[in-house]
Structures are given as structure tokens and as C-alpha cells.
Amino acid sequence: MAIYTRTGDAGTTALFTGQRVSKTHPRVEAYGTLDELNAALSLCVCAAKNPQHRQLLENIQLQLFWFSAELASESEQPAPEQRYISSEEIAALEAAIDTAMGRVPPLRSFILPGRSEAASRLHFARTLARRAERRLVELSTEISVRHVLMRYINRLSDCLYALARAEDHDAHQNNIIQKVAERYLAAIRTSATREPAMSLSFQELHQLTRAAVMRAEELQVPVVISIVDANGTQTVTWRMPDALLVSSELAPKKAWTAVAMKTATHELTSAVQPGAALYGLESHMQGKVVTFGGGYALWREGLLLGGLGISGGSVEQDMDIAETAIAAINVRTHQ
């Protein structure tokens, strides 16, 4: 079946009522821009990772068909049997906005539009929604346009912005998880190929623990001392009398974090701040990772031997005790 009629070859098009108008008519510009937006939303649906976002975007695409049909008709009100935009659709957009914005950190400056493909496409669609809104405002100076349509298109651009932020946030968090997993797997592979002798001996474990206890006694700070091997498995845990109960949880986590991330825990502090590369790491690791001082990776000849975690005093005291203990044996805190 032919899709061409040749009736538009002269630069005119027909409205639903049969009236022919110029293809540059504000009414045609308005629903034509909605058509552009709908096509862009198809790309958004394909790129979005969140299934709820995809379903919402498909619903919006259907609603834009109703919207365009209303603009292509000269009737001031939609026919009773016609599907049309109502306050219900606006409420759904507002609910989606609130949900998406409730999941992302606040912004204090302008951002580049989109760090992921889905967010980039959503931001592009947002600009088309804004253009459609401008065309609708222009059209409203010539004909009567239902106010609910103005509200809907205004809210739609906000919704696309919120979805873009949420898609970016999810992509960033997934990237963090992937990086942590890669580092952890790399640590496992390294441990599987290292020389059997390249681990802390019983004498070194004893010396490390003893040096930590002696320094803690000098500072009059009861602490918990935890040492893990290169696989993150605990080899030594020593709790001094009167050490805080919470320290029995924190010290092993500090030691494990130092091995998993191959770095001292205090060096992670800046990396997990909002906007930094590892922001959200702690929540995604369900509290297993510690990002304040007291945990150190233990290296020798470029190989990771294990990790030391101290908890019980202030961050500075924990770091002091750990560094004093490390100085007592032949290891480094950096590769």
C-alpha cells in the first residue's frame, strides 16, 4: 500500500477536520515538535536501564499521541470518545519526578547533560519537550489551548530531567560496584599466583600485634587489633581490656577494606564524597567498607601480604598505633 498521497506536495497538510493549512502553521509546528519528541523517547526507552523508567516512557509516548491528536483538531475540547491528557497523567509525572529526585544527591551547580547514554538521550528529549512547550505557548496566542496541556508539557520536561539524573546516578553506582569487584578479583588472582612464602609469618603477626598493643598502652587507648591475609580472611584479632564493643566490628572491617581496595582507609575519605569517583561505595557495600583512618594494606616487594585494622581511639590515634606497629616489621603501606 502506498504511503504517499501527493496532497502535501504544495506545502500544506490536512487537520483532522479536513481543513488544509500550511506546514508552517503554529498548530502543525506544535504537534510536529511533539512528533520529534516522541521519536526521541523511543531512543530513551531503548537506552534506559531502569525497567520502571522504560514503562513510564512508553506510557508518555502514548500520551503524546493523544496530545498531538488534540492539537491536530480544531475542536476546543476533545470528543467524548477521544483519549486526552488529564490531571491524572500530570499526577503520574509528578510522582515519577519525586521518586527519581529522592534517589539522587542534590546539585549545587550546573552539570553537563548526561554521563551515561540513557541520561544523554533523556536530556536531549528534555530539550525537545521545552521546544514543544514554546510552540504550544506560541499557538495559544492564536487559538484556545486547554490549560492542562500547558501543565502537562511543562511537567514532562521536568520529568525527563529527573529520569536523566536517576539514570546517571544508577550508572555511576554500578560503575563503582564494578570497579570494587574488579579490584577484589584482581587481589584474589594475585594471591593465587604469589609465592607461598610471601605472607606474614607467625613471628611477624605476633610482632605486629605486640607493637600495636605497646603503642596503645603508651597512649592509654584500649583498642581492637585485627590482621587479615591477602584474601581478606582474619588471621589475628586481639581485643584489649575495656576496648569499645563497636571496635570489634570496625577493626576487621578496616583491615578488610585496606586489602579489598589495596590502600589505606583514610585515603578513601575524599574519594567517597558527593561527586567523587567512589561516592556511594559505603552504602552499596552494605557497611562492609570503612573509609576513615585506621586500616592499612601491608606490602612487601610489590606483593600484598594482608591488612591491619586498628579501632578504639580517635582516627588519629588509631592511625598512630597502626603506623607504629607497621614500622616494627619489614612491610610497606603502599605498593
Curated annotation (Swiss-Prot):
<dbReference type="GO" id="GO:0005524">
    <property type="term" value="F:ATP binding"/>
</dbReference>
<keyword id="KW-0479">Metal-binding</keyword>
<dbReference type="InterPro" id="IPR005624">
    <property type="entry name" value="PduO/GlcC-like"/>
</dbReference>
<comment type="pathway">
    <text>Cofactor biosynthesis; adenosylcobalamin biosynthesis.</text>
</comment>
<dbReference type="InterPro" id="IPR038084">
    <property type="entry name" value="PduO/GlcC-like_sf"/>
</dbReference>
<dbReference type="InterPro" id="IPR036451">
    <property type="entry name" value="CblAdoTrfase-like_sf"/>
</dbReference>
<comment type="pathway">
    <text>Polyol metabolism; 1,2-propanediol degradation.</text>
</comment>
<dbReference type="InterPro" id="IPR016030">
    <property type="entry name" value="CblAdoTrfase-like"/>
</dbReference>
<keyword id="KW-0169">Cobalamin biosynthesis</keyword>
<dbReference type="GO" id="GO:0009236">
    <property type="term" value="P:cobalamin biosynthetic process"/>
</dbReference>
<dbReference type="GO" id="GO:0046872">
    <property type="term" value="F:metal ion binding"/>
</dbReference>
<keyword id="KW-1283">Bacterial microcompartment</keyword>
<dbReference type="GO" id="GO:0051144">
    <property type="term" value="P:propanediol catabolic process"/>
</dbReference>
<keyword id="KW-0460">Magnesium</keyword>
<keyword id="KW-0067">ATP-binding</keyword>
<keyword id="KW-0349">Heme</keyword>
<dbReference type="GO" id="GO:0008817">
    <property type="term" value="F:corrinoid adenosyltransferase activity"/>
</dbReference>
<dbReference type="InterPro" id="IPR009221">
    <property type="entry name" value="PduO"/>
</dbReference>
<keyword id="KW-0408">Iron</keyword>
<comment type="subunit">
    <text>Forms a complex with PduS.</text>
</comment>
<dbReference type="Pfam" id="PF01923">
    <property type="entry name" value="Cob_adeno_trans"/>
</dbReference>
<dbReference type="InterPro" id="IPR029499">
    <property type="entry name" value="PduO-typ"/>
</dbReference>
<comment type="function">
    <text>Converts cob(I)alamin to adenosylcobalamin (adenosylcob(III)alamin), the cofactor for propanediol dehydratase. Found in the bacterial microcompartment (BMC) dedicated to 1,2-propanediol (1,2-PD) degradation. PduS and PduO allow regeneration of the adenosylcobalamin cofactor within the BMC.</text>
</comment>
<protein>
    <recommendedName>
        <fullName>Corrinoid adenosyltransferase PduO</fullName>
    </recommendedName>
</protein>
<keyword id="KW-0808">Transferase</keyword>
<keyword id="KW-0547">Nucleotide-binding</keyword>
<comment type="function">
    <text>Expression of a cosmid containing the full 21-gene pdu operon in E.coli allows E.coli to grow on 1,2-propanediol (1,2-PD) with the appearance of bacterial microcompartments (BMC) in its cytoplasm.</text>
</comment>
<comment type="similarity">
    <text>Belongs to the Cob(I)alamin adenosyltransferase family. PduO subfamily.</text>
</comment>
<dbReference type="GO" id="GO:0031469">
    <property type="term" value="C:bacterial microcompartment"/>
</dbReference>
<feature type="binding site" description="axial binding residue">
    <location>
        <position position="206"/>
    </location>
    <ligand>
        <name>heme</name>
    </ligand>
</feature>
<dbReference type="Pfam" id="PF03928">
    <property type="entry name" value="HbpS-like"/>
</dbReference>
